[in-house]
Every structure is written in structure tokens, then in C-alpha cells.
Amino acid sequence: MDMYLPVLPSMTSWFMTSDALVQLGLTTGLIGLAAGQLLFGPISDKYGRRKPLITAMIMFITTTAGCIFASNIWQFIVMRLFQGLAGSGAVVLSRSIATDKYKGDNLTVTMSLISAINGVATVAAPIVGGVIGAFGGWRTIFWSLLALGIVILAGAFRMHESLPARVRLVNARDTEYVSHRTSPFISVLRNRLYVKYVLIYTFSLGVLFTNLASAPFIMQDHFGLSAMDFSIVFGFNAVAFAIASAFLPKFKSRSQAITFGTVGMVVVSCLIMIAFATGCGFWIYEGLIFILLSMVAVTSTAGNVTAMDYGRDVAGAASALLGAVGYGFGGLIPVIVSCGDIFVMTGVMFLLCSAMTALCTQIPEYKMSDKPRTV
């Protein structure tokens, strides 16, 4: 998704359509990412991680080709939906595999590293996308995504299974998944601690998705940045996300990290609304966004790790719900942001998501089990 952000405005001209419809391609991709995780997560709990990952990558390559050859915006939007569906396999399985292999502090370090790597990828993606888009147009960006899918597919074929059959059988008995035909989703949703941290993760991630939806238009259309300039600035902001994610293990506890990040999100969101209202310059806007994304990284990564720790008995389903709720909510945000003045809607969504994150941190834990409860 990040890779073609710099060319969103130019895609509006290429397809001869509106900004809202081009943003709808972001929305459908996120909806696909959300829905697909609900499919690949439980399947991987039952059949292992390797085969579903291979299947997902084959689907991703095929649907990316569909995006390339789309002749109108509606074909592109539909292909983006299925591309997101396919790409969700890699997203959900990366968390599941980490949870299969690690626990406790080791899981925190590993998931923080994964988030940092994602941040580095986010740094590179818009910069590379801006360069490719400047010389080859938006379709060339999707050709590069297709090539990346082939590389990941090759890696999936060489990957060792992290959830062997004997472990799958033990997990199935422990969660009564087989004997009572209980949905693994119901099992994990009955763990209220898991639900709490999924909500914290989701609403904090909403701030990130708001920035993804609005930044190309604010930076390019309002502040006059070129696609290449936008790519560099966007990549610089992603550095904040990567560094902050990697810094998570330095906190005394995940709860401390969440409190720190949430307070920072609320304060900076208020400052951004004031800056928008007073007609701030570019560098004030950029500085506030940099700090805001750092706070989001700390909060969302800590929420992610904690939720997966509480849902490890059915890690595939837990990862699926985590991703589905997060990306499903994120898929609504571009539509909301495009419904009114982009500065007003961006500021409102920043503050709303930050406030909801803060509200979720106040959900009491004294009656909650410290371990995932099964039916």
C-alpha cells in the first residue's frame, strides 16, 4: 500500500476520476487485508503455516497482475480488494510464526524487531515508489510488487513449518476445537484481556491509517511537494515508526509503554488540530506528524505483542482477529477522511482515535484472567 502512495494524485488523472475513488482503492485493499486474515488465520492453526503462506503468495502474484492490467478505476478497485485478501496471508502468518517460536520477553523483542523491519520497509517503499512512479508510471510500481511476491513465494517454499502436526493436535485438544467444534474465534474472544489489547492496537493504528490517507494530498496538493519530495518526507516519518517500535523492549513493562504512547498521541493530536486551525507551515506540520507516529509505534506495537501473548493457544485465530479488526477499521478511515475538508477530517480522526485508545486503556483488568480462557 505504501509504495504507490506518492502516485495517488497522478492516478486520479490517469483514470480520469475523483480523489475519493482513488482513495477507495486504499479502502478496498485494507478491507481485503482484514477479511483475508479471518480466513488464513484459522486455516493455519489447523493445517500449519507453510502451505497457507504459499497459497497466499500465489494469489497475491495473480491479483497484482490484475491491478496492472486494470483498464478503469472500478477494475482496479476490485483487484485491490483481492490483492489485499491475498496479502493478508503474509501479514497474519508473520505474527503467528513469531508466536509459535517465542514467549514472554523474547516475543516482545521479536515482535518489536518485526515492527521495526516493517518500519524500514515503510521507509523504503514510498521512496522507491516515488522513483519508479516518476520514471515508469504507477503500473511499474505494481510490476515491482509482483516481483516481490515471487521472491516471497520462493522463500515460502524453503521455509520450515513452525507449527508441526503434533503441536496442532495438542492445541486443538487444549482449546476443545475438535471435540466441541468450537470456533477458535469464540475461544479467543472470551479472553477479555486479549480483546482489550486488540482494541488498543486497533484505535492506535487508526492514527497511522489517517495519516496514510491524508498525507499525499496535504503534502502534495496543499504544501506543493513533488511525488519525490513526498516520498522522502514520508520515508523520514517512517523512520520514527521503526525506531520507536524497536525501542519497546527498553520500557519496564508493556503497560508503561502503552501509557506513554497513548498520552503522547492525545497531546500531539490536540496540537495538530490547533496547527491546522491556525494555518501552520509545512515544517510545523511535519514535526508534529513525526512525533505522533513515534507515539503510535510504541502504543500499537505494545498492544500487538500483548494481545498475541494472551491469544497464543490459537495463535492463527488470534492473529487473524487482531489484523482483521485493525485493518477493517483502517479501511473505513480513507472514506471518512474524504467526506469533508481534509484538514478538519484529519485532525478529528487523529484526536478521535487517540481518545478511543486512551479510553480502552482504562478497561479494568482486576476481574480478567491472566491466561487465555477456552470454552
Kindly label every feature range from the protein language model.
Residues 16, 48, 69-75, 86, ...:
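Helix-breaking motifs and short loop linkers at transmembrane-helix boundaries and internal kinks
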Residues 35-74:
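Conserved MFS/SLC helix-loop-helix module at the cytosolic interface between two early adjacent transmembrane helices
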Residues 59-66, 74-82, 283-291:
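Paired small-residue
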Residues 75, 104, 112-160, 164:
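Helix-loop-helix hairpin linking two adjacent transmembrane segments in secondary transporters
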Residues 79-120:
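Cytoplasmic helix-loop-helix junction between adjacent transmembrane helices
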Residues 162-197:
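Juxtamembrane intracellular "pre-TM" segments in multi-pass secondary transporters
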Residues 258-302:
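C-terminal transmembrane helical hairpin of 12-TM major facilitator-type secondary transporters
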Residues 306-342, 349-350:
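A late C-terminal transmembrane helix in Major Facilitator Superfamily
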